[in-house]
Amino acid sequence: MSRAKVYGLLMALAVLFTAGLCACSAQPHAAAETAPQTIVVGIDVFDPYSYLDRDGQFAGIDVELATEAFSRLGYTPEFRMISWPDKNDLLSDGMIDCIWSCFSMNGRETKYQWAGPYMYSRQVVAVRAGSDIQSLSDLAGKRIGVQATTKAESLFLGEISSLLPEVKQVNSFETTEDMLAALRKGYVDAVAGHEALVARWTNQDESSYRVLDESPYSSELGVAFAKGTHADLAAQLTQTLEDMKQDGTI
């Protein structure tokens, strides 16, 4: 074999070897590009929507829906327990990417970048079993317990138009546990909140509490991003949630 042919063969082998190295080095990079992105989801203790189970793991309706929806979009949700009154500061400071915790869209349509609605919820009122309160009109002059910065608080403070009577006092609590404890101990005459939350609690002790038949308000639940951010993701998430309704996931 001539020297020229040997040289040509060596050059061809060198090109193939170099190409192989480039392909090998590119594979991890490609894998990294397709790896799920992490998105930080702020949630509150709001059983049965979001809470910590006995093993300290995040659980609940919203946790399951968020995990499935973001997975379909190529994201891995990182759930972060937050203080509900601090939610807006955490969102604007970038400590969380979104709020997904039985959050009502109604009356807040222009305050956030929304995805949804994905579910509907009624506000209800619960009282002690022996209470003389039988209807919403009987709440006149009574002491009401609500969780701070919730739709129920806005309703009873008169920030939202409703047929509720004027009450004696609105007591706002940081957590639902504190709110429910206040009713149990007689510090308030009634409490108000999302139907699923109140029903889950009263069903555990039906002999001690009951829920009024009338509902003061119905609302749409959505996922809130900071206003002016994540517009594309919010639109994609809205479509994904709609797909989940159609396929029976929701």
Describe each region flagged by the PLM.
Residues A19-A23:
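C-terminal motif of bacterial Sec signal peptides marking the signal peptidase cleavage site
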Residues S25-P28:
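Bacterial signal peptide processing site
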Residues A31-C102, S172, Q236:
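Extracytoplasmic small-molecule ligand-binding "clamshell" domains
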Residues I43-V45, Y120-V127, E195, A199, ...:
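Periplasmic-binding protein-like
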Residues L52, A66-Y75, A152-F173, T202-E206:
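Ligand-binding cleft/hinge of the Venus flytrap
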Residues V63-R72, I133, S137-D138, K142-R143, ...:
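Extended ligand-binding regions for polar small-molecule ligands
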Residues T67, T76-D138, Y209-S215:
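Acidic, polar ligand-binding/catalytic clefts
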Residues D89, S101-K111, L155-G158, A182-S218:
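A ligand-binding cleft/hinge motif common to bilobed small-molecule-binding domains
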